[in-house]
Amino acid sequence: MSGTMSGTLAEASQQLRGQTTAFLNFCRIEKGLSLNSLEAYTADLSRFKEFNDKLEGLPGTAEIRIYIDHLYQSGLSNRSVGRHLTTLRSFYGFLLREGLIQTDPTEHLHAPKQWQTIPKYLNLEEINRILQAPDLTRPTGLRDRAMMELLYASGLRVSELCKVGMGDLDLSFQVLRTTGKGNKQRLVPVGTEAIQAVEAYLQSGRAGLLKGRASRFLFVTARGGCMTRQAFWKLLAGYGRKAGIFQGLTPHVLRHSFATHLLEGGADLRSVQIMLGHADISTTQIYTHVMRSRLRDTVEKHHPRA
């Protein structure tokens, strides 16, 4: 344990609680993080505090390493453990900058290697099947088709898709404005088929769902509220079963499909990074399976001794 962070179990628990509150307030007020990010930070730090409450005092590097091992043993994936460690790094980085601690116990800890397997994505035939699944004679079917088309056409996160406002999509210029992680705005081009699906929903579906009510959101429920991530997730899984795609169809699979098909079509990694809203291109490099395949095809096609 570090020198100034000793004390009784109760004192340590209270101190950690106060530090956590200060960090979350900083993330909410000064960094302007989204509700989703705040909820993730809160959940990660609550789990960390629950583990730490069993220790005597506040944790140092050795204790945090034990905690990381504990997460592995509980069955979390490399990606999830990596996210927990990222949360702790942000937390202790804040405490260090504020002068609340003298050393950062996470400084020499390394995140696990992520994405050891290729992200799951659909092929073009599967994409067509899933997009044809909604019943376009119903307002909900028009909405669901428009949401899936827009998600596949833009690579939005599901939280971004659900929060698209009426003024965020320019149908004439075929461009969408969205606010991603860290309150960062980006403009994403949208293809003609997605635009047409949204127009059909606006013309024949949305008013039937609202029934005279007003909403600033583009995609609404039968009760006139904003479509939630959980509701869309459930709808998409249902369409997956209808289309014969049973295993693990989530909104993120459509996002992965968007990125994969762009790269297969010749887009560069930097452009895909911008459209996905990744702050660091290393995140986008999970799609290097496509780049490797394309390079291999290029060599086989053009090298005289391939």
What is the role of each PLM region?
Residues 1-306:
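Conserved catalytic core of the tyrosine transesterase superfamily
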